[in-house]
Amino acid sequence: ALTKQYGNYASYCMLACGNEPSGRWVPWVSKFVDYWKATDPRHVYTGASVGNSWQWQPHNQYHVKAGARGLSWTGAQPESTSDYRNRIDTVKQPYVSHETGQWCAFPNFNEIRKYTGVNKANNFEIFRDILNDNHMGGMGHDFMMASGKLQAICYKHEIEKTLRTPDYAGFQLLALNDYSGQGTAL
């Protein structure tokens, strides 16, 4: 039904069977990729989006993996000339970075009242209480603004580094939405 309804849409060019599977998933996703390659060759297929420690999927037409991303600022000063080529140059298929970024920003405590019911921002309340307990309750807004600026700088650096990398097929960002309560991965 998916391919009949949407198969010719310009935005439907890639398909993965899932995200971060567990168990004995490589044989199953290999069959998934082989099935779809034979059934509908208009698109390219991968088994799943995975972290760096997950196995490589040998039947993929492209890989979505977390390995070639991140900042190197712990071992060197920030710069704007490096790329990730040495982390993808041995991969034969196109490489897409899985969940690029995930740079956290301090929460906006003024939003706590907006989250109710199952979406109640208990984690925000905990962070606010920790600040209050340490006599820094009035600094929440400053922390939010400073961490938000750092978050923007980190995303900019990482995305630009990805775009500078020859043959890098792209990147995925995690949870671009208005609700900032995905656990504490804000």
Where are these regions (language model features)?
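Substrate-binding/catalytic cleft of secreted carbohydrate-active enzymes
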Residues: 1-170, 174-177
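Extended hydrophobic/aromatic segments used for targeting, binding, or gating
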Residues: 180-186
